[in-house]
From Swiss-Prot:
GO terms for cellular component: chloroplast; chloroplast stroma; chloroplast thylakoid; extracellular region; magnesium chelatase complex. This is Magnesium-chelatase subunit ChlD, chloroplastic. Keywords: ATP-binding, Chlorophyll biosynthesis, Chloroplast, Ligase, Nucleotide-binding, Photosynthesis, Plastid, Transit peptide. Residues 1-49 form a transit peptide. Involved in chlorophyll biosynthesis. Catalyzes the insertion of magnesium ion into protoporphyrin IX to yield Mg-protoporphyrin IX. The magnesium-chelatase is a complex of three subunits, CHLI, CHLD and CHLH. The reaction takes place in two steps, with an ATP-dependent activation followed by an ATP-dependent chelation step. Does not bind abscisic acid. The magnesium chelatase complex is a heterotrimer consisting of subunits CHLI, CHLD and CHLH. Interacts with CHLI1 and CHLH. Belongs to the Mg-chelatase subunits D/I family. GO terms for biological process: chlorophyll biosynthetic process; photosynthesis. Induction: Not regulated by light.
Length: 760
């Protein structure tokens, strides 16, 4: 491509020329925005264009328009300009998923993961600009659809306004786009009492939350992996049910809530719980590699948008308007799309081959396939629709590293060919003709059904991928998975932490929730003023109105080192444990982790360093390192459990991990350690089996107490008995054989195990 020479040597003019001449050729046309030439959508495009270009107003009062003239917005206009979705380079899979969500808001939601700067938020906000406006009932708090009176919120029938021709008064508004902030409270999310209106009317008045505003629009959650666990569970429960039922503070109210959920997150800042991702239909990654040309085009179009956004709007105006029309028509055609039973069997078999748990994947995949057909203006699902649905829904949920079930449903074998016999010549000719016609009809039907199902599966019978090009995509999806829950990483209390929600007090109120207290008292202000004789008080709050604050704070972990201080290698083990403890304390300032050291020697164990986060205290306590004597391993583990339980009661510890640095050999019973006077001097020495059974019993109690055990075996491999590994097995903990481990190795091993524990 030749560039026109520039007379001026100014770098600004050179950049402008490069941008205007080169970028339109480098910027690929988005595949998902190209309409098929042959279907009903193309013929109806101009009919619906008028509806897509209507000037509307959002529920928040912000004027918005989707007309052609509005795309040429002056760069000096006040307000934020959102990057158009059609101008995003690459990410065709994510843009296709967003278009599917725009067609069917109840598709199940879309989750986009990716590192910083991968256009996750840009694409989510860009979708809002191509959504067509919606018609709502005037006075509705949840964008009620006039065509669906069964889904209206409570009391809307009493607030309906009518036109002169006795029809319900409606208005056209822009599809809402509601973002959930990370610090959102429960009352702001689901709704609460409107204090001002309740005081005026003398009765409880409901104030809608963000879920009511998002109905029939887009509900966007940025950094969903950092959202409070209780809020995320509440959010997904409401979206799954499609209705928000509020029963609190004297309120009994319900309203529909069926928005399109779009969630984005950065896996480097924390994984998302697998349970949460399973309830989202499409999970895609924005970290897929881009070609050099695409990266150049992306930087160029972003630079052009920052300087002259109106040029970018004009450049993608046709694609944007086409997408708006495509969404409107596809919503109508979706009602007529059918998917056959054989196609459902194909989706189920793909899910079984991929090792997908549950049935949500098949349900979501069937809905995605129907949306793909509706976008193309078809009434039947095709092979391409099925394969695309598997790639978008089932593939990210697959477990490629797991062994699939031994017995899987296989397609039925083809019927055997008819056999010729001499007796056939004696049959009636009419019957033969009828049978031949029936067979030909069945063959035609079978051929038609086979044409609607892919000939090859994406997953083979052993659970592997047939197409190696999809392997990277599946691996990216598996990296995004988190664990089942992280409830113990947060501590709830009434005195310290971040205010998350109000609650009825249990005893004396430590922290008064003023907002919730006023909401509870608001409906009774009018009645209480009438009973007040003095007339001097402005606000009347009684004891029954009191609400306490429910606080939450980050929970630290407690690492308890149980060190064998007996034998000739005791000093080395104690020195390594001391170094590992100091290293962990130096790194635990932000994580609030605590460290404790319990050496066991002689006849009993002692708490040399109680749970602490102070490095100075640890240095002072660990100056004296006692060594030598017997090996009371059972008492050392029992003491660690007692220290852990006491730390849990203090309310500062969420997770507890016991790190046992030992060779697994013990020669002192627990009874001798706890009550030495009860043992007679001439009592026989305990057998090895008795000592081992006692230690294994303590290991089982560690697991039942909810604590994690990490065993670092220091036994010489030439005389190893393997009992240390048995201890870890009974406690369902981790085992490492590190006979000559340094403090750095022990601290690194403990840190990795602690990280896995926090994410479990």
């Amino acid at each position: 491509m030749a560039m026109t020479p520039v007379a001026s040597s100014s770098p600004v003019s050179t950049c402008r020329l490069f941008r205007c001449n080169l970028l339109p050729d480098l910027l690929p046309k988005p595949l998902f925005l190209s309409l098929p030439k042959r279907n009903r959508i193309a013929s109806c495009r101009f009919t619906v264009r008028a509806s897509a270009n209507a000037t509307v107003e959002s529920p928040n009062g912000v004027p918005a328009s989707t007309s052609d003239t509005d795309t040429e917005t002056d760069t000096t206009s006040y307000g934020r300009q959102f990057f158009p979705l059609a101008a995003v380079v690459g990410q065709e899979g994510i843009k296709t998923a967003l278009l599917l969500g725009a067609v069917d808001r109840e598709i199940g939601g879309i989750a986009i993961s990716g590192r910083r700067g991968t256009a996750k938020t840009v694409m989510a906000r860009g979708l809002h600009e191509i959504l067509p406006p919606i018609e709502v009932v005037v006075g509705s708090i949840s964008n009620a659809d006039p065509a669906c009176p069964d889904e209206w919120e409570d009391d809307l029938d009493e607030r309906i306004e009518y036109n002169a021709d006795n029809t319900i008064k409606t208005e056209i508004v822009k599809s809402p786009f509601i973002q959930i902030p990370l610090g959102v409270t429960e009352d702001r999310l689901i709704g609460s009492v409107d204090v001002e209106e309740s005081v005026k009317r003398g009765t409880t008045v409901f104030q809608p939350g963000l879920l009511a505003e998002a109905h029939r629009g887009v509900l966007y959650v940025d950094e969903i992996n950092l959202l409070d666990e209780g809020i995320s569970n509440l959010l997904l429960n409401v979206l799954t049910d499609g209705v928000n039922i509020v029963e609190r503070e004297g309120i009994s109210f319900r309203h529909p809530c069926k928005p399109l959920l779009i969630a984005t997150y950065n896996p480097e800042e924390g994984a998302v719980r697998e349970h949460l991702l399973d309830r989202v239909a499409i999970n895609l990654s924005a970290d897929l590699p881009m070609s050099f040309e695409d990266r150049v085009a992306a930087v160029g179009i972003a630079t052009q948008f920052q300087e002259r956004c109106n040029e970018v709007f004009r450049m993608v105006n046709e694609e944007t308007e086409t997408a708006k029309t495509q969404i409107i028509l596809a919503r109508e055609y979706l009602k007529d799309v059918k998917i056959s039973r054989e196609q459902l069997k194909y989706l189920v078999l793909e899910a079984v081959r991929g090792g997908v748990q549950g049935h949500r994947a098949e349900l979501y995949a069937a809905r995605v396939a129907k949306c793909l057909a509706a976008i193309e203006g078809r009434e039947k699902v095709t092979i391409d629709d099925l394969r695309k649905a598997v790639e978008l829904v089932i593939l990210p949920r697959s477990s490629l590293d797991e062994t699939p079930p031994e017995q899987q449903n296989q397609p039925p074998p083809p019927p055997p060919p008819p056999q010729n016999s001499e007796s056939g010549e004696e049959e009636n000719e009419e019957e033969q003709e009828e049978e031949e016609e029936d067979e030909s009809n069945e063959e035609n039907e079978n051929e038609q059904q086979q044409d609607q199902i892919p000939e090859e599966f994406i997953f083979d019978a052993e659970g592997g991928l047939v197409d190696e090009k999809l392997l990277f995509f599946a691996q990216q999806a598996q990296k995004r998975r988190g664990k089942a829950g992280r409830a113990k990483n947060v501590i709830f209390s009434e005195d310290r932490g971040r205010y998350i929600k109000p609650m009825l007090p249990k005893g004396p109120v430590k922290r008064l929730a003023v907002d919730a207290t006023l909401r509870a008292a608001a409906p009774y202000q009018k009645l209480r003023r009438e009973k007040d004789i003095s007339g001097t008080r402005k606000v009347f709050v009684e004891k029954t109105d009191m609400r306490a604050k429910r606080m939450a704070r980050k929970a630290g972990a407690l690492v308890i080192f149980v060190v064998d201080a007996s034998g000739s290698m005791a000093l080395n083990r104690m020195q390594n444990a001391k170094g590992a403890a100091l290293k962990l304390l130096a790194e635990s300032y932000t994580s609030r982790d605590q460290v404790s050291i319990i050496p066991f020697r002689g006849d009993a164990a002692e708490v040399l360093l109680p749970p602490s986060r102070s490095i100075a205290m640890a240095r002072n306590r660990l100056e004296r390192l006692p060594c030598g004597g017997g090996s009371p391993l059972a008492h050392g583990l029992t003491t660690a459990v007692r220290v852990g339980l006491n730390a849990e009661k203090s309310g500062d510890v969420g997770r507890i991990m016991i790190v046992a640095i030992t060779d697994g050999r013990a020669n002192i019973t627990l009874k001798r350690s706890t009550d030495p006077e009860s043992i007679a001097p001439d009592a026989p020495r305990p057998t090895s089996k008795e000592l081992k059974d006692e230690i294994l019993e303590v290991a089982g109690k560690i697991y039942k107490a909810g604590m994690s055990l990490l065993v670092i075996d220091t036994e010489n491999k030439f005389v190893s008995t393997g009992f240390a590994k048995e201890i870890a097995r009974v406690a369902q903990g981790k085992y490492y054989y590190l006979p000559n481990a340094s403090d750095a190795v022990i601290s690194a091993t403990t840190r990795d195990a602690l990280s896995d524990l926090k994410n479990s």
